[in-house]
Structure formats: structure tokens, C-alpha cells
Amino acid sequence: MSASRPALSLIVPTRGRPALLTRFLKSLAATARAPQQFEVILVVDSDDAPPTVPPLPFQVRVETGPPGRTMGELNNAGFAASCGDFIMLLNDDVIVRTRGWDRTVLRQFRRFPDRLMLVHVNDTLIRDHLCTFPILSREYLDLIGSFCPAEYERYRIDDHLQDPFDMLAAVGVRRTVWLPDVVFEHCNSVNHPEAGAVYESDPAILARDAPRFDAMLPVRKAQAIRVLERIAPEKVALIEPIHDSFALRTTGRQITVRPLRARIADAVQRAIACHRRGGFVGLFRAATRRLA
């Protein structure tokens, strides 16, 4: 982070939901360890009531523009107004649940000195399948030369941002970090009788955005190639045969990062389960399999 700008910019389009926005902002303040390191850019419409922002330990700026903009245009407006070294896309219907989320997120970008990577948190609905709230570096966005295609009305923006990194993983270059224990609860769900809380898209808007996503596959391939030209030029030719973005979403394509306490708790739970199934013999067999 330079002395003249924040490390992280959070871009939050918001309209007509002041109570949700206030709840979100307060949850940020309650959980951040170093709030002076980030800023929040609220992207609002000129025909909406100006947001009332409570006293907060971080900077909040309001970017106002004409009504009727697509979500792609709203995000681009927020990005144009941002100053951070890293950019995170968010919604106003979110509650941040994890203390120290800011330090955990920023720490991940030390993994690769070039910062050409994607980090995402646990939205509690789509989880590791899709980067609902993606975090990208300014270096990466400068390299690919764009942010959000303005054509996307509401959906497929996260798919679009994730897809080049799924392509990289498909050719053996993992640059996506998934943080399952950093929880940004997305409070936009319906209750499914079998699956529980699930995110539900507007089918009419999705029917327009999905073909746009398909049509922009060559754009995303070009972005993946730009990254490979920088970090693994010998793999560039492997991108061209890719034709199905959703087929790339395989287990293991991401680097999963968990705190030590969570890993220990998981190990204890596995040990208890093995003991219940097979007593000490089952526990011993499970341990030897882990060591083999």
C-alpha cells in the first residue's frame, strides 16, 4: 500500500435500502482490524435519496450517477472512483461475520509478488463454486485492460471475473485463493425444502445476461493469455481449445486457505467420526491412511 491511497477499495452499488446499507457498514466496522486501510465507494443513482452514513472508522465516498445503469456500469463507476491497490465487489445486503477479515484478505496477495490472482470469501450461499464477492489487484486489472463489461445487467459479472482464473487452473496455474472461514453473509436467499437457503436469480434478467457471458468467451480467453504471457508463456497455446467455462469449475482448482484453529477442529471432528465408526481400530486405520 502506498502512503497516498488505501490498500483496499470496497465497491458497493446501493439503491433504496438504507437500513441494509447501515447494517453492512456497521458490520464492516465491527470486524475490521485495520479500518484505516480500506475505503468504501457507494455507487448510487441521482434520483435516489442520498445515503445516510453513520460515524465510521474508515472512509466512505459516494459516487452518484444517472439512474437506469446496468450492474456492470455501476461497478465500473465505483472502480473509476476507487483508489485502492485491491478492489472488492460487494452488495449492501451483506453482514460481515469474521473478525480480522481485512488483514486475512490482504495477506493472501503476498503469495504472488506479481499480484495476478483472485481472492474470494465465503458468501454462505454459493461458497467455493463462484466468487460472489471477488477481490482483484489493480495490477491484474491494468494488465487485462478492463473491469466489468457494461453489458451485464445484473448477473454473470462474478462468472466473468472468475473464468480467466479457472482457465489458468485448467492449464496447471492456480491463482485463485478461496477463504472459507472469512464469512461475508449474503442475506439474499430463498428457503428450498431440500437444499435450505439458496440464491435465486431473476430468470428474465438471467436469460439476457447468460448469452452475453457466452459471447464474451474470447474476451476472457484473451485475459487468461495475457496473464500466462507474463507468468507461464509456455502454456499460452493450451487456452485456445477451452470452450466450456462451467466445465472448468472442478475440485482443486483453487488454493483453499484456512486458519490453523479451523484445520485442527476439522481434524478432531474427523477423528471423532472415525472412532465412532470403528473404535480405536478405525481411528488407527484413518491415521495410517493419512500418513501413507
Question: PLM features: what roles do these ranges have?
Answer:
Residues 65-82:
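Glycine-rich, basic loop-to-helix element that forms the pyrophosphate-binding segment
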Residues 6-9, 39, 160:
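Cell-envelope/extracellular polymer assembly enzymes that use nucleotide-activated donors
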Residues 94-133, 139, 174:
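Conserved donor NDP-sugar-binding/catalytic core segment of glycosyltransferases
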Residues 25-66:
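Acidic donor-binding segment of Leloir-type glycosyltransferases
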Residues 1-29:
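N-proximal low-complexity "stem/linker" segments adjacent to membrane-targeting elements
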Residues 23, 159-292:
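C-terminal catalytic/acceptor-binding lobe
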